[in-house]
Amino acid sequence: MYGKSPALVLPLLLSLQLTALCPTEAVEIYTSGALEAVNGTDVRLKCTFSSFAPVGDALTVTWNFRPRDGGREQFVFYYHMDPFRPMSGRFKDRVVWDGNPERYDVSILLWKLQFDDNGTYTCQVKNPPDVDGLVGTIRLSVVHTVPFSEIYFLAVAIGSACALMIIVVIVVVLFQHFRKKRWADRADKAEGTKSKEEEKLNQGNKVSVFVEDTD
């Protein structure tokens, strides 16, 4: 039994060695996962990838869409050396290429969002010989307004604090200005009173001298 096993094991070992030398790699896709955008605005559907194979002319990118309320999958965009926009359908004249394959970026830009754009967008990248891998997904929610987040509240708080500081500085500067002006007015008034008293005193002295001369 054991004497015959090497003939059976040898092909298996060779196949394992070949698999180890030439492993099957997969393209990894990265997306935001979930995204909210306001109705009527434009949104960037970001999709990046990593691949063990160098990016070349064989790279292909396929974007598809499945509505949230169900229905068949719809074509959104295709890229192979050049971008190919949809010639018909809901995304005609509403989607443009916004990626850079050399930087592993295959994002697209969707214009003039509508409420029926709610759904899941898929991003599939093939970079031969890396053709396997999971498809990236983005769940887009089109809303009337984007709810305030902590970042917005923080920005409002910082802006309010800066405005308050500016107001305080202005009040202090104005207070110092009017205070100096008031002291200057008081000094001028005191100087004027002193001058009048000196003038009266001089006139009194002149009268006294005149009376003495008359006598």
Curated annotation (Swiss-Prot):
Membrane topology category: Single-pass type I membrane protein
Effect of disrupting the coding gene: Mutant mice display early-onset progressive sensorineural hearing impairment that is more pronounced in the high frequencies. They show an altered organization of outer hair cells and supporting cells and degeneration of the organ of Corti, accompanied by mild degeneration of spiral ganglion neurons, that is most pronounced at the cochlear base.
Main location: membrane
Residues annotated as glycosylated: N39, N118
Limits of the Ig-like V-type domain: 27-141
Stored SMART domains: IG, IGv
Cysteine pairs bridged by disulfides in the record: C47-C123
GO cellular component: plasma membrane
Keyword match Membrane: yes
Superkingdom of origin: Eukaryota
Cytoplasmic topological segments: 176-215
Record bears the keyword Cell inner membrane: no
Family matches, as CDD domains: IgV_EVA1 (cd05880)
Transmembrane feature ranges: 155-175
A GO BP entry: T cell differentiation in thymus
Signal peptide start-end: 1-26
UniProt cross-references to SUPFAM superfamilies, sorted A to Z: Immunoglobulin
Location within or outside the cell: Membrane
Tissue specificity comment: Widely expressed. Expressed in the cochlea, in Deiters' cells, possibly at contact sites with the basilar membrane. Expressed in both outer and inner auditory hair cells. In the stria vascularis, detected in the basal cell layer. Not detected in thymocytes, lymphocytes, macrophage or dendritic cells.
Disordered as annotated region, ranges: 187-215
Sequence similarity: Belongs to the myelin P0 protein family.
The protein's role, per its UniProt record: Mediates homophilic cell-cell adhesion.
Protein name: Myelin protein zero-like protein 2
Organism classification: Eukaryota, Metazoa, Chordata, Craniata, Vertebrata
